[in-house]
Amino acid sequence: NHSYSDSRIKITRLDKNYGIAGNMNEAIKISTGDYIALYDHDDTLEPQTLFEFVQLLNENPNIQVIYSDEDKINEDGSTYFQPHFKPDFNIDLLCSVNYICHFFMVSKTIVNEVGLLDSAFDGAQDYDFIFRCTERAGSENIYHIPHALYHWRMHQASTAENPESKMYAFDAGTRAIQAHYDRVGIHATVEKGK
C-alpha cells in the first residue's frame, strides 16, 4: 500500500476501543492538516475526491465546510447503487434527516472552536458534529460538491444495509437535533417520527 510511504498519513493502533466518537477523536488529535475529513474505515472514495475538495478550497479560501454526494457499494466493491444526490446546504432539511452524512470535511479552526465528536451521541456522533460545525461556519461558508465521491459500503451490520441494525442511532439522532435547537435558542421538542 503506497499510503504507508506517505509521511502525511499516520497509522496508529489504540490501546483500547474508545467507542465510535472516541476512536475518531484520537485520529483528529494526531492530525496536522488544516482540514479534517470524516471517513469510515470500510468505505471508499473516488480517486479524485481529495483533489476536488482541495481545488475548491484553493479557489474559495473562506469555505469552512464541504460535503459531497454519495452512493452505496456492495460488500465486495463490485456494484454501486442508490446514489444520494444532496441539495446545497439546507438547515431545515438537516433538522429532519442527516442528509450530509458522508463525505464531510471541516476546517481545523472550526473543530478547535466546537470541540471533538461527543461520545454521548454515539450512533449519530457525526450528525451532532455536523450540526455544531455548520452552526459555527454559517451557511455562506458551507459548500456542496454535486458528485458522488464517497461510496458507503453495505454489509449485514451496517446502517447502510439495515438502518434498524443500530436502533440506538435513531435515539442519538433525535438527541442531536434537540441539542442543535437548544444551542441556537429554538424552543422545540424533538420526537421520533411514526
What are these regions (language model features)?
Residues 21, 29, 79-109, 122:
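A recurrent flexible, glycine/aromatic-enriched loop bordering the glycosyltransferase active site
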Residues 110, 120-148:
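A short, conserved alpha-helix in the catalytic core of glycosyltransferases
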Residues 85-86, 90, 156-194:
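Non-catalytic membrane-proximal stalk/linker segments that position and tether the catalytic domains
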Residues 48-80, 155:
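Conserved donor NDP-sugar-binding/catalytic core segment of glycosyltransferases
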Residues 14-31:
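Glycine-rich, basic loop-to-helix element that forms the pyrophosphate-binding segment
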Residues 40-44, 69:
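The conserved acidic donor/metal-binding loop of glycosyltransferases
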Residues 36:
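Short aromatic/hydrophobic "clamp" motif used to bind/position activated sugar donors
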